[in-house]
Amino acid sequence: MRQDHLITATQLSRDDIEAVLDRAREVADDPAAYADRHAGSVLALCFFEPSTRTRMSFDSAAKRLGMNTIGMGDVDSSSVSKGESLSDTVRVIEGYADALVLRHPSEGAATLAAERVSVPVVNAGDGAGQHPSQTLLDLHTIRENHGLDDLTVGIMGDLKYGRTVHSLAAALTEFDANQHFISPESLRLPRSVRFDLHETGAQVREHTDLEGVLGELDVLYVTRIQKERFPDENEYHRVAGEYQIDAETLEDAPDDLTVMHPLPRVDEIAPDVDETDHATYFEQAHNGIPVRMALLDILLENAEGDEGMEVDR
């Protein structure tokens, strides 16, 4: 029996995405119908990097499905600090849990984990690679505000190291969205991501400033500069704060522009934006609960041999 994992957004077809988002809408409309749906099951939260929203929302989502959760706690207090390999760690944890959520600083870590275990694995961020469950809640937020067809989306900030960007850009190609990428030259999309987007037929439009494209956008997706990914701290300080928006920036934006951010933010969105009708990032964060409930529900259904979203690894 084939187990399903969610490792990259590129694995998701439009039908896969809509299956999760439709289920998420059902969960949001009638959460009681999903309570105790997976009572007795256990979700392992394996976070080798700091996390607030992703970890807590998966924890909450699992418990709202009736699951128990287990976690590693501080990595320094685990056997990883003794030199245990990721492969050994996940193979041991597989015996304790029915599904595994993994965040790791190394790109490809979730792929390795999925190759080693037979329970569903969800990639909760692998270095500067991907973050597909974040993409699902991003798309849910966009759909609830605009729908997913005929979109023009601007993605601004750290496009080189921002894993949420890489996942979202890939998923938006399933909906033929017009995408504009706004960043300093040093933080433009990685060549491999640009190549993959071109392979889908997507138009990759790159800009170094927001002003020229703001009026065209339905969605502006802002990301922080990923300080922890920079090999040279001097380079980080050179570009930090270069791409910021405030309420004044948005005065000429379309009235229905949705401003999103995967959070945490530093200074790239000023607090005065919170008071505008454009701000959607807290709604976006809250959408992590129904979306991750839906995702876990479907993956566990697949693991049990029922019909659900097909996610090939």
UniProtKB/Swiss-Prot annotation:
Any one Gene Ontology BP term: 'de novo' pyrimidine nucleobase biosynthetic process
Taxonomic superkingdom: Archaea
Pathway: Pyrimidine metabolism; UMP biosynthesis via de novo pathway; (S)-dihydroorotate from bicarbonate: step 2/3
A Gene Ontology molecular function term of the record: aspartate carbamoyltransferase activity
UniProt xrefs under InterPro entries: Asp/Orn_carbamoyltranf_P-bd, Asp/Orn_carbamoylTrfase, Asp/Orn_carbamoylTrfase_sf, Asp_carbamoyltransf, Asp_carbamoyltransf_Asp/Orn-bd
Keywords assigned: Pyrimidine biosynthesis, Transferase
Keyword Cytoplasm on entry: no
Residues binding carbamoyl phosphate: R53, T54, R103, H131, Q134, L263, P264
Acyltransferase as UniProt keyword: no
Described function: Catalyzes the condensation of carbamoyl phosphate and aspartate to form carbamoyl aspartate and inorganic phosphate, the committed step in the de novo pyrimidine nucleotide biosynthesis pathway.
UniProt subunit comment: Heterooligomer of catalytic and regulatory chains.
Family: Belongs to the aspartate/ornithine carbamoyltransferase superfamily. ATCase family.
Name of the featured protein: Aspartate carbamoyltransferase catalytic subunit
Organism listed in the record: Halorubrum lacusprofundi (strain ATCC 49239 / DSM 5036 / JCM 8891 / ACAM 34)
